[in-house]
A protein has these predicted regions:
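N-terminal binding-site loop/beta-alpha segment at the start of enzyme catalytic domains
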Residues: 1-76
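Active-site beta-loop-alpha junctions enriched in small/polar residues
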Residues: 22-24, 52-54, 81-85, 113-116
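Glycine/proline-rich, positively charged
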Residues: 28-29, 47, 87-121
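A structural signal for isolated positions on well-ordered beta-strands in alpha/beta enzyme cores
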Residues: 77-79, 109
Length: 121
């Protein structure tokens, strides 16, 4: 079972496998299908969910927030990413607040800069 997790330097255990959510939540016509797919993954033990504020302009985060209700937050490993242009002060505070609101949680397990370079033109 220990092979399923990577122990980070702070002692936290991060699942080695997870679910990416790029392009999820963008189309209301398949929202329930996407929610069921995420639930199926969670039910099978895929507890790491990766998203970003740019995925559907927050709609992916909102889908995840709706989906994880009823699951133990402590058993999930939520990762989100901030746009590079929002990574400075004060924008990063607004971005993380919006992400937490969208995900309906009060903390993230990991928060990353989506890419460390200026936005492509």
């Amino acid at each position: 079972m220990s092979d399923l997790y990577l122990t980070l330097k702070n002692g936290m255990k991060m699942p080695r496998l997870g679910m990416g959510t790029w392009m999820l939540g963008e189309h209301l016509s398949i929202y329930q299908q996407e929610k069921k797919a995420l639930q199926a993954g969670l039910d099978e033990g895929f507890t790491l969910i990766d998203t970003a504020e740019m995925y559907g302009n927050g709609l992916s985060e909102k889908l995840i927030g709706d989906t994880i209700q009823g699951y133990s937050r402590e058993k999930l490993f939520l990762v989100s990413k901030v746009y590079p242009h929002n990574a400075g002060r004060p924008q990063i505070y607004d971005s993380i607040d919006q992400t937490l609101h969208n995900l309906k949680t009060d903390y993230l397990d990991m928060y990353l800069i989506h890419w460390p370079l200026p936005n492509p033109k």
